[in-house]
């Protein structure tokens, strides 16, 4: 019944399986890609009617992780998959960026690719299989693509490159997490997060991944040849008939406009030129330029003319938009500490692109809980990228983060992640918000710079600055090409590449490559790295001139934290029955208290004195009471034979009527009342740890019983006091402060 075609490939020690013809047979292309027990179903469907009014390729890519793939039922009130997670959006973009350069430039048909994780094996990541499966599904769909691609992940283990490292063997991903997509002869996409890897080593890693893809691409070609589906025919776009005439009459005007230095000046001039071009063709006899479709074709032809003139400027004169040299960085202005009540802020302006970054420091309860198929983790570093419509002088509704915003924010986060201190060094949850207040290209890399500046201004102990730069490419005939540093929005649109590089002074922390051509070679990547390093060093110098090291103190508006380590068996004492003790502490001192399973206690609050008092109370709770210790207590209950005194939070002791004072007492109520503040001394502890107290706190009263204990001095909340304690029974192991 099924005409299944199955291809298995031995790929560097793993078996890659590609199957088609069994599942989703109504799709134009459907491939089940598997490795180990991870399987991803990739489907392609395209509209057979060409959209003539489209000036872009309407491609939609959707990656979906189904909970059943990992044997789970979705959490939450509604037990089914909801909106796409950030990770699903990021993988969708990864697939899109890998395959988009493959399509025929004249193909303008609605196309949808859906990748569904059907089965999940924790050893093998489904994102690589999704890219490979999408490439294979496209190859058999009948869509005109130039050539298929493969994809691979590269890690580093023991200073050696490893292909597709096992997910839960983190040693292969900690130093480098690189994804490369490529055809037989060129690279189409790169995505990387790295621990300050130098350019030479990064290039070698890209080459290693690129050269490993041959068996994958061969397998896709074999499946394609087995299917032999007719290729959908595309026609040349009708706007091409206007190109020569536009270049003949308007080249000089377009060139002058492109050389203007500011974005607004260029856009205004280009708008005037566009109207002149439309008027020119409208005035001609038998013109169709008043027709809506034909006006759109004229605009497309004008765009082609701008692209050709831009390319000629770069390749022939080494001059670019804004009259810059190919390696020239736009003017940079950095400012730190703009707002008093936020915990940290910085403004980074590069040409007509501007990012305003703000820092918020929070407690461990502010950490983001992220659920994926293979794990549920808490993230204490968050970065949000917000692209505001006024940044490009436009009006649009303010909605939830777009896929583009999620992708740009994630790239900036990966670039900065390396320098973020560990929780042991800096226990705060850190949230960075980058708002793009002005945009003319490279806003994600401006976010990297503003985020780094704001972290130092906030006093977060990062070890060094991270800077980002977007590199462009203009391809000429033969092997001729030029690399552009710090591309503007127009250069991104008219050029062939957007290669984002983030780095410290020591090495690369993140990469992202998008291209509009069929691929680029390793020589172009090497030239990009070399030129990007010069640009990044320049940017780092400007940033260091503004602020070169973290401030010594946090903002007075930031929360304060003090950490204690207590014995595990004392955790229940701090929490209390039904959480009574910890709730009382939080309410009394207006603090948050976080207790981990290993006995680490963090106390958070906005008022330092309250934090210190809460810590002192916790130390009192876990403190092992010893005979002779003196406390300030409160009468909580009075009975005929004596009174119960709360001598520390959560701890009561009993004072017999005979221990109220040295005289005989007939009526205890005449001497102590509920709520009285009294000074008490421990004079006995029975086998059930019940504490016997006295109000007669003279030293001689317990002189002999104290001899077995040592006098030590401890510091609690910055206040020294002498206590009696048996060293082996100490419950407070250590006390760390993160504020003065």
Swiss-Prot record:
Pfam family of the protein (one): S1
Alphabetized GO MF terms: 3'-5'-RNA exonuclease activity; magnesium ion binding; polyribonucleotide nucleotidyltransferase activity; RNA binding
Binding site for Mg(2+): 492, 498
InterPro entries given in the database record: ExoRNase_PH_dom1 (IPR001247), ExoRNase_PH_dom2 (IPR015847), ExoRNase_PH_dom2_sf (IPR036345), KH_dom (IPR004087), KH_dom_type_1 (IPR004088), KH_dom_type_1_sf (IPR036612), NA-bd_OB-fold (IPR012340), PNPase (IPR012162)
BP GO terms, sorted: mRNA catabolic process; RNA processing
All copies of domain S1 motif, residue ranges: 628-696
Listed name of the protein: Polyribonucleotide nucleotidyltransferase
Gene this chain is encoded by: pnp
């Amino acid at each position: 019944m099924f005409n299944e075609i199955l291809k298995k490939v031995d790929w560097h020690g793993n078996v890659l399986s590609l199957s088609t013809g069994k599942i989703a047979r109504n799709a134009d292309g459907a491939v089940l890609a598997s490795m180990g027990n991870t399987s991803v179903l990739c489907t392609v469907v395209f509209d057979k009617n060409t959209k003539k009014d489209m000036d872009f390729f309407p491609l939609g890519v959707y990656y979906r992780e189904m909970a059943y793939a990992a044997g789970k039922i979705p959490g939450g009130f509604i037990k089914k998959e909801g909106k796409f997670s950030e990770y699903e959006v990021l993988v969708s973009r990864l697939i899109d960026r890998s395959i988009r350069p493959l399509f025929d430039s004249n193909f303008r048909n609605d196309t949808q690719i859906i990748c569904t994780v059907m089965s999940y094996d924790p050893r093998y990541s489904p994102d690589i299989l999704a890219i490979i499966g999408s490439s294979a599904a496209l190859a058999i769909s009948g869509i005109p693509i130039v050539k298929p691609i493969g994809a691979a992940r590269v890690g580093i283990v023991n200073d050696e490159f490893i292909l597709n490292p096992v997910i839960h063997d983190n040693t292969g991903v900690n130093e480098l997490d690189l994804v490369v997509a490529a055809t037989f002869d060129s690279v189409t996409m790169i995505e990387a997060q790295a621990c300050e890897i130098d350019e030479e080593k990064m290039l070698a890693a890209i080459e290693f991944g690129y050269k490993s893809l041959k068996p994958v691409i061969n397998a896709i070609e074999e499946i394609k040849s087995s299917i032999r589906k007719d290729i959908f025919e595309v026609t040349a776009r009708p706007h091409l008939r206007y190109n020569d005439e536009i270049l003949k009459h308007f080249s000089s005007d377009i060139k002058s406009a492109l050389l203007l230095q500011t974005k607004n000046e260029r856009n205004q001039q280009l708008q005037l030129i566009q109207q002149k071009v439309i008027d020119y063709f409208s005035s001609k006899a038998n013109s169709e330029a008043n027709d809506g479709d034909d006006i759109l074709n004229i605009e497309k032809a004008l765009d082609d003319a701008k692209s050709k003139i831009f390319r000629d400027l770069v390749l022939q004169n080494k001059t670019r938009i804004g009259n810059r040299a190919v390696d020239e960085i736009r003017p940079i202005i950095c400012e730190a500490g703009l707002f008093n009540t936020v915990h940290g802020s910085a403004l980074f302006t590069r040409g007509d692109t501007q990012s305003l970054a703000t820092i918020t420091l929070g407690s461990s309860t502010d950490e983001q809980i992220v659920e994926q198929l293979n794990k549920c983790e808490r993230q204490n570093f968050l970065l949000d990228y917000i692209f505001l419509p006024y940044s490009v002088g436009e009006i649009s509704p303010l909605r939830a983060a777009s896929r583009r915003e999620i992708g740009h924010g994630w790239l900036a986060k990966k670039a900065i992640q390396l320098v973020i201190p560990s929780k042991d060094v800096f226990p705060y949850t850190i949230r960075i918000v980058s708002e793009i207040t002005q945009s003319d290209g490279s806003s994600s890399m401006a976010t990297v710079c503003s985020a780094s500046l704001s972290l130092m201004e906030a006093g977060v102990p990062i070890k060094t600055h991270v800077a980002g730069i977007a590199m462009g490419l203009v391809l000429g005939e033969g092997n001729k090409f030029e690399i552009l540093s710090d591309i503007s929005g127009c250069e991104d649109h008219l050029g062939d590449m957007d290669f984002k590089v983030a780095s410290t002074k020591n090495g690369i922390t993140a990469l992202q490559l998008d291209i509009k051509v069929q691929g680029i070679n390793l020589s172009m990547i090497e030239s990009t790295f070399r030129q990007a390093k010069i640009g990044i060093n320049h940017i780092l110098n400007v940033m260091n001139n503004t602020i070169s090291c973290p401030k010594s103190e946090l903002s007075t508006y930031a929360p304060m934290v003090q950490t204690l380590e207590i014995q595990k068996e004392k955790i229940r004492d701090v929490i209390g029955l039904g959480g009574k003790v910890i709730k009382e502490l939080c309410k009394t001192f207006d603090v948050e208290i976080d207790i981990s399973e290993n006995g680490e206690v963090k106390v958070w609050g906005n008022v330092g004195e309250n934090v210190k008092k809460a810590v002192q109370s916790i130390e009192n709770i876990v403190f092992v009471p010893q005979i002779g210790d003196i406390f300030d207590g409160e009468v909580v209950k009075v009975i005929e034979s004596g009174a119960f005194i709360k001598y520390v939070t959560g701890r009561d002791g009993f004072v017999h009527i005979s221990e109220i004072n040295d005289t005989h007492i007939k009526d205890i109520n005449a001497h102590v009342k509920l709520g009285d503040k009294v000074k008490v001394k421990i004079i006995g502890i029975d086998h059930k740890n019940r504490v016997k107290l006295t109000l007669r706190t003279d030293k001689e009263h317990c002189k002999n019983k104290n001899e077995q204990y040592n006098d030590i001095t401890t510091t609690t909340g910055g206040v020294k006091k002498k206590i009696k304690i048996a060293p082996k029974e100490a419950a407070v192991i250590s006390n760390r402060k993160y504020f003065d």
